[in-house]
Design a protein with these regions (language model features):
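Short, hydrophobic secondary-structure boundary micro-motifs
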Residues: 41-43, 71, 99
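Juxtamembrane/interface motifs at transmembrane-helix termini
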Residues: 49-53, 61-63, 105-106, 138-140
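Acyl-donor (CoA/ACP) binding surface of acyl/acetyltransferases
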Residues: 1-37, 75-179
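A short helix-loop-beta-strand connector motif used in the catalytic cores of GNAT acetyltransferases and
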Residues: 60-73
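Conserved GNAT-fold acetyl-CoA-binding loop/helix
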Residues: 38-60
Length: 179
């Protein structure tokens, strides 16, 4: 049995949520939510249909000592939501840059979850980067609004491959600079 470890990834609190490292016990809810095509289609990496073992492998990678990405569960227990509402992540691009990613389960859409946690993590800047990037698919304007409302500036159009769609999808790229 593999023990759970937390390698200097902080547990932090927003007004309504606890952002914490993944636990193996999160597997069922993460798998349930990511099997939803509406979630998978708005990410680059979640396949649809979700193959057996994918969530367990994802959790294993997130708990690895040599990971390049910090992933937090958006835990909604203190707001009487689910223990897993979604995920938010920061991937180290280099020593001065990171890329923000997130998804929220459809049951919690339009409740301010993404806005609250994106603002919190981007303001906290836990990797102490000079710049933080984020990209959203152009058919997801709600996520674009979240980013602009949280202080990110639009910088360009691009494309990213979406595993669930099995195609390249137009994106908008955003940047937040720190002093």
């Amino acid at each position: 049995m593999i023990l759970e470890k937390n390698f200097i990834q902080p547990v932090v609190e927003t007004d309504r949520f606890t952002l914490r490292p993944l636990r193996r016990s999160d597997q069922g809810l993460i798998e349930f939510y990511t099997k939803d095509e509406r979630v998978a289609r708005m990410t680059t990496t979640i396949p649809h249909p979700l193959p057996p073992g994918a969530t367990e492998a994802f959790i294993d990678r997130s708990l690895s000592e040599d990971r390049e990405e910090d992933i937090w569960v958006i835990d909604g227990i203190k707001s009487e939501f689910s223990e897993v509402v979604g995920l938010i992540s920061l991937e180290r691009l280099n020593q001065t840059q990171s890329e923000l990613g997130y998804w929220v389960a459809p049951a919690f859409w339009n409740k301010g979850v993404a806005s609250e946690v994106v603002r919190f993590v981007s303001d906290m800047n836990p990797m102490k980067n000079r710049t933080m990037f984020a990209a959203v698919f152009q058919d997801n304007p709600a996520s674009a609004r979240v980013l602009t409302n949280c202080g990110f500036d639009y910088i360009s159009d691009a494309e990213a491959f979406c595993v669930a769609r099995n195609s390249s999808v137009p994106t908008w790229t955003y940047l937040k600079k720190y002093k």
